[in-house]
Amino acid sequence: MPLLLTGQAFRRDLEANGCLAVQAPLEGGAETRLLRRLRGAGYSTRMTSARGLGDPEVFLTQKHGIRPPHLGHQSVGRGAAVGEVQEVAPQLGDLFESDAPVALWLLEGQVLSRSELLSLCDLCKREPRLRIIVEMGGARSLKWEPMTTYLKA
């Protein structure tokens, strides 16, 4: 198990490709172990779910609007025709304040469409400090490949 002990091959592939598709064991543990190794190498890390992400690029890097649940209440002339809109800070905004590289681990990445996965790859190319790891399902052992290679298959 030297792969899980050092994580150097994973980090080397992540830095070379920017966006990786990962298949991790379903019992868990591999993702937190690798994130701990990345933090030890100087990365700022964040783990989040891909469910409910919406437009990934806007959600992760730009200030954007959301509509809170109405909970059955009627708005009386306070909001727009579509309802109240609240502005939300980007998910990765605080991680980009330092000069450290940023690693984002997205759980349940199999719910994302092909175009959303390609936009994540493009985002890694435009923002050189950002590295994205997308968990694309389970496997008996930890496997990863570049996202572009995964999408071609």
Swiss-Prot record:
Disulphide linkage map: none
Topology in the lipid bilayer: Peripheral membrane protein
EC number: 7.1.1.-
Catalysed reactions, as listed in the record: a plastoquinone + NADH + (n+1) H(+)(in) = a plastoquinol + NAD(+) + n H(+)(out); a plastoquinone + NADPH + (n+1) H(+)(in) = a plastoquinol + NADP(+) + n H(+)(out)
Enzyme class: translocase
Tagged with keyword Acyltransferase: no
Keyword Transport appears in the UniProt entry: yes
InterPro entries assigned: NAD(P)H-quinone_OxRdtase_su_N
A GO cellular component entry from the record: plasma membrane-derived thylakoid membrane
Record's keyword terms, sorted: Membrane, NAD, NADP, Plastoquinone, Quinone, Thylakoid, Translocase, Transport
GO molecular function ontology, one term from the record: oxidoreductase activity, acting on NAD(P)H, quinone or similar compound as acceptor
Subcellular location, record wording: Cellular thylakoid membrane
Quaternary structure and interacting proteins, as annotated: NDH-1 can be composed of about 15 different subunits; different subcomplexes with different compositions have been identified which probably have different functions.
Sequence similarity: Belongs to the complex I NdhN subunit family.
Cross-referenced HAMAP family: NDH1_NDH1N
Function as written in the Swiss-Prot or TrEMBL entry: NDH-1 shuttles electrons from an unknown electron donor, via FMN and iron-sulfur (Fe-S) centers, to quinones in the respiratory and/or the photosynthetic chain. The immediate electron acceptor for the enzyme in this species is believed to be plastoquinone. Couples the redox reaction to proton translocation, and thus conserves the redox energy in a proton gradient. Cyanobacterial NDH-1 also plays a role in inorganic carbon-concentration.
Entry protein name: NAD(P)H-quinone oxidoreductase subunit N
Organism this protein belongs to: Synechococcus sp. (strain CC9605)
Gene name, Swiss-Prot/TrEMBL: ndhN
